[in-house]
Amino acid sequence: ETVSTDFDTGDRLYFEPLTNEDVMNVIKAENPIGVVVAFGGQTAIKLTKFLDKKGIKILGTSAESIDIAEDRERFDELLEKYGIFRPKGESVMTLDEALTAAERLEYPVLLRPSYVIGGQNMTIAYTDDDVKQYMAIILAQGIENPVLVDKYMMGTELEVDCISDGEDVLIPGIMEHIERAGVHSGDSIAVYPAWNLSDRMTQIIIESSKNLAIELRTKGLVNIQYLIYKDELYVIEVNPRSSRTIPYISKVTGVPMVDLATRAMLGEKLKDMGYGTGLYRKSPYIAVKVPVFSFEKLINVDNHLGPEMKSTGEVLGVAGTLEEALYKGLIGAGYKMKKKGGVFITVRNSDKAEIGEIAKKYYDLGFRIYATEGTADVLKKYGIDAVSVKKIHESKTNNTLTLIESGKIQYVISTSAKGRIPSRDSVKIRRKTVERNIPCLTSLDTANALADCLKSHYSQHSTELIDINHMREEKLMLKFTKMQGIGNDYIYCSTFDQEIS
């Protein structure tokens, strides 16, 4: 979410922190006609109020519009105007207010600060104790903006990146997350185009995105995260800025989003840019974005995925089917995709109603299933001959940790969310998978997708390299130009005639 630091990309390159004082020093040195905050992530967005008060011109979406998107009460008024739903929620400043709000909304609830960065300090609370623990941490840091308490709804999460010129909106594509709401969008596996979306819901998303972008008077990029729960569309949040999915959606759709957004910020109209308005046509392939993690370098960090972002990168899998694209993405992210061996399963009580069908897929593929006692009892009801494994404190020589160390396990499914304390069994198990380089799936949706992928029998020998440009209806002109100072000849490629000239 930052500008490239290549010396030959920008006219100027400053290595300075994004603080009020340092940014003002750069502005004084450069004396620009205006500044763009939309490409600096949430950190840059937080500078908008300060810059506006200093009389600095904000190019693109105004400081006022950004504040409406971030201010709960003002944003709720906007949603009410267009009949757009959002999960019920309240803004609080104290522990008592947070407990009262959680009781009113009913558990589970999602707790997060305003102007949140990367899901930082974001958590799902299931009890009063969870709220007390969270608020103690937040209040100790000192808060300037309210803490948001939202009703947590486990539905299908979707993401839309739009370009707006203030009058029209272009939506290059709609992405669907494999993991249900509750896992940070940066840690979710995202699929383009969305594969479970009805025509009716697609139209609602298009209309809602257009209304929100225009009513907020956005000029440039806007990222909107949606939730489908019981066949109703809810807005999770609207970010009037560039998101981490911009490079992904630009690449797979062929829409140069940064270029078009910058032109819109400077006053050009979308209808004059050649890409139309509304929802851009679907690409003839499936593209899957898979997150990459670096848990092996982080000591005592739980690899359970939740509202707080933990990934450090991402890879892209492209193919004609979802299963093949997912297989490519998982291989690229470091999964070995082993097709025999053992699967160890331990899930929280709320997941036991769903784990049976998922475990059956692994069982039918020939995997040996191991599980903790409670989970094993559930699996046996589905005809799965699961081997019951003792917990860490129940046996020193034959427990969950020794099983993982034995080399019998190829995949671990562990969904217990109680992961803030390193001494807990669930955290120890997940950390052991990191040490042994065993894929650990902390969401049932990820485990289900992996099982379907293994069931499809794709391998590195049966997949093929895809040139997405060849599959598009309109080919893109690719130019390889000479780089300064290295003395190499350049190659000019025109994909219209598929010949190098």
Question: Predicted regions span which residues?
Answer:
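Short beta-strand segments
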Residues: A38, E237-N239, K289, T346, ...
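A glycine-rich beta-to-alpha transition motif near the start of alpha/beta enzyme domains, typified by
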Residues: L476-S501
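Class I SAM-dependent methyltransferase SAM-binding "motif I" and its flanking Rossmann-like core
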Residues: A451-E473
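ATP-dependent carboxylate activation and anion-phosphoryl transfer catalytic cores
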Residues: E1-P32, T43-I45, K57-G60, Y82, ...
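ATP-binding N-terminal substructure of ATP-dependent carboxylate-amine bond-forming enzymes
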Residues: E1-I84, M93-T100, V318-Y458
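Short hydrophobic alpha-helical segments that form membrane-spanning helices or hydrophobic packing faces
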Residues: G119, L450-D452, Y492-T495
